C-alpha cells in the first residue's frame, strides 16, 4: 500500500512539474508575443505621427504665405512647391490635397483664371450666394489612390472637417478601399490664419479657419514591409482594426486569423480621441513540443520511482532478516536445552564412574553445579552479543539524556540510519536482482534530470558587493556583471580633502579606479567609461578606515547610455534601478538586495558532463556488443574451418601475394580486388579475394561483410567439380580474405570478348570425348551442371544470385567452374522463400521479378542462366549499345529475331558460321525460355539440362 501511495505521489508530482513548466513556457511565449506586438504598435503609431507632422508643417506654410492672397485658392504648382518644402523626410502619405473656403465671387474668378470649374458645397438650408462657400481641391498624386478628396461632400468627411477645425488637431476618417485595392485612411487638418491666438477658443478657431488639408495614408502599402522586417524568430500574423463602431473594420492584415490561439491585443493611439484602433498579433504556428518539461517530469518520475524501489526493497530485506532472527530465536531454547541435557548426561555418567573411588554423598551439589554451568537462559543467550557491545555507563547516561531532549526526532534519525545501513549492506548482494532495463532507464532519467537542472538560469542574490581589504582600501566585487556600465555614488562624511572639489564629476576607468577625495558629507559621483568587453571583478577605493555607503546604478544596455554620458546628464540615472551596499567593516561578507532581472551564466560543465557520460556509456555498450558479435562470428568461422577450408594468417597471405603487389592483381570485384598468390607450404597457386573492413562507404562495408560470411558458409558445404574450390579464409581486423583455387584461364567474360582470341563453338558447347569417361570443352553444360547441383543435389537449395560470365571461371582445359558465392542464399527445398531486404545483383542478369518481390528462388538463377546462354551464343553483352536495329537489350533483340523466324541470325558473327546449327538453335531457344518474363513459364534447371 505504501509503495502504491509513493508511486501515485511521484506521478502527481511529475505531472505537476510538467504542468508548471508548460505554463511557464506558455507565459514566456505570451510575453514574447506581447513585447513583439507592442513594439510593432509603437512603430506604427510613429509612422502615422510622421504624416501628421507633415500636415501640420504644410498647414503652417500655407497659412503664413497664402491666406492673404486674392483669390485665396492655390494653383497646383504653388501647392507642389509647398509640399516639397515641408517634406524634410519622404512623406508617408500617398497623396495630399488642400481645400480652401472661398466666396462665390472668388470661386467664379478662380474658375475663369484656371479654366476649370470647382464643385460647390451642398447645404441643407438655402443661403445667400454672397455667403456660399465652395471647397477647392488641389491634390498631389491623390488621383492615383482615390476618385476625389471632396472633403465636404459626404457626411463623415464634413464631420471630420468640422472636428479638425474645432480641435486644431489631425483627425482620421474610417478606413476605406483605395483604387489599388488596399486599405487606407484620410488624415484631415484645419488651416488657420496666421493671426490665430495661442489660447484660441473653439469660436476663434471656427472664425480663423481658411481651409483644410487632407492626406491619404495607405496602411497596407506603407506598413507591410515595415512589419515584415520586424518579424521575430517565430512567424506571426499582425492585424490592425478600427474599433470605433460596433463591428471592427480591418485596416491591415489577413482576414484569416487561424493560428495557435495565443493572441495579444495592443491599443493604438493615432492622436484622434474619437476613433479607436487595435493591433492583434498571433503566432502562425502552434507552441513547440515541451521537450524540456517532458524530460524534467520524466527524469523526476524515474528517479523518484528508483528511490522508492530501493527503499521498498530495503524494507522487505530487513523484514526478511528480522523474520530469520525470530525463527532463530524460537529454535535457540530447544537447541540449548538439548545441548545441556547431553552435557548433563555425560557428566552424570562420569560421576557415577568416579563414585566407585570417591565418596559423593557429602557433595550432592556437584550435579547442581554442573546443571548451573551448562544451562543458560535463552533470552540471555540471544542478547549476549548485544550486551558485549554496550557502552560505558557515562556514555549511556549521555545518550539517554540526548534522546530525552530530542524526543521523537532521535527515534526517527535512528530508524533512518538503520535503514540506510541495511540498504548499503544489502545492495551489493542483491545487485544482480535488479532488472537491467530499470537501471538503464533510471540512468537515462538521472542524466536528463541533471541536464535540465543545469540548463536553468539560477538568479543570484549578490551581483555586486563591497568588502574590506587592508587598512586603507575598500574592495568592490563584481559577482555577475560581464557587460555594461556602472554609476557609483560614494557618500560618506569624514574623508579628507586632497585638492579636488566635492562637486566635481569625473570619468574613471574601472580597471584603474583609485580615488582619494573628500566629499565632506557631499556626494561624489564616479562615472564609468569602461570600454573593454568585461568589467573587472575587483575594484579598490580608498576609505581610510571610515564607514562608506555605496550606491550602485546598473546599466546593462550600453547603447542607452550614449546620449546620457556624452551630454553629462546625471539626472537620467534616476530611471535605472538603484542597489545599495552598506559596509560596516572589512570582515563583513558582501551583501546586496537580490536583482531578479539578471541571471548568472550557466556553467558549461553542467551541460557537458551529462553529455559526456551518455557518450561514454554508449561507447561502452557499443564496444561490448561489437566484441560479443565478433566473438560469435569467430566461433562460427572456426567451426566452418573444422568442416572444410582452412583459416590462414594474414601474414601468410601477404607473403603469398608479395604484399598484394599490383603485378599479382588479377582483377577488381564488386567489393574488393582479386590477387594471385602462391602458398609455399602447400605448393598451391591460389586466387585471393580481398574484402576491406574499412571502406569509404559504410553500407558497402556492411555488404562486403555479409558477402564474406555468406560465401564462407556456402562454400564449405559444396563439393563439385564445376564449382570453384574454397581453399581457406582469413578474417583480420583490417581485411577479410577468401582463398580460392587458381583458375588458369580466368573468367569466361574475358574469353568471350577477347578481340584477339575467339572461343570456338566446340569450346562453348560441343562435347569432344577424349575417352569414354573424360570430356572437355563444354562450358554451357558445365555451368548447367553446377546449377543442377546447387538447386537439387545439396542438402539445402542454394540460390547463387549472381550468375554471369565474370563469375564463370575456366581451368586449363576450359572446364567451367562457378564461383563468387557472395550473394548466395540457402532455401529449403519446396519451402517458401523469405523476402530479402537488399536487392543485389548485376544489371542485365538479375531477374526483373526479383526486383519487385525480392524472393530468392531458383527461378532467379534460371533467368540469369538464360541470359548467359544467349550471351555465349550471340557474343554480345545483355545491355550493349551496338545491338542491331537499335534494340534496347540482347533479350529483346533475340526475341524479335525468333518471332521473325531468323533465330540463327543472332549467332556470334565472329564464328563465321562454324557451328552446329541445331546446337546453336537449341542454346538460343533455351536461353529465351529460361529468361521468360513470367517465372512460371520458365523451365527448371533439370528440364533445361535435359534439352541441352
From Swiss-Prot:
Binding site for ATP: 666-674, 689
Keywords carried by this UniProt record: ATP-binding, Cell membrane, Cytokinin signaling pathway, Kinase, Membrane, Nucleotide-binding, Serine/threonine-protein kinase, Transferase, Transmembrane, Transmembrane helix, Two-component regulatory system
UniProt-listed GO biological process terms: cytokinin-activated signaling pathway; phosphorelay signal transduction system
Enzyme Commission numbers on file: 2.7.11.-
Compartment(s): Cell membrane
InterPro entries: CHASE_dom, CHASE_sf, Kinase-like_dom_sf, L-type_Lectin-RKs, Prot_kinase_dom, Ser/Thr_kinase_AS
Residue ranges constituting the Protein kinase domain according to the UniProt record: 660-948
Catalytic site: 802
Membrane topology classification: Multi-pass membrane protein
Chain segments carrying region Disordered: 570-596
Segments forming domain CHASE: 70-280
Membrane-spanning segments: 291-311, 438-458, 602-622
Pfam family, one: CHASE
Extracellular side: 1-290, 459-601
PROSITE patterns: CHASE, PROTEIN_KINASE_DOM, PROTEIN_KINASE_ST
Cited SMART domains: CHASE (SM01079), S_TKc (SM00220)
GO molecular function terms attached to this record: ATP binding; protein serine/threonine kinase activity
Function comment: Putative receptor kinase that may be involved in cytokinin signaling.
Record family assignment: Belongs to the protein kinase superfamily. Ser/Thr protein kinase family.
Protein's UniProt name: Probable kinase CHARK
Classification lineage: Eukaryota, Viridiplantae, Streptophyta, Embryophyta, Tracheophyta
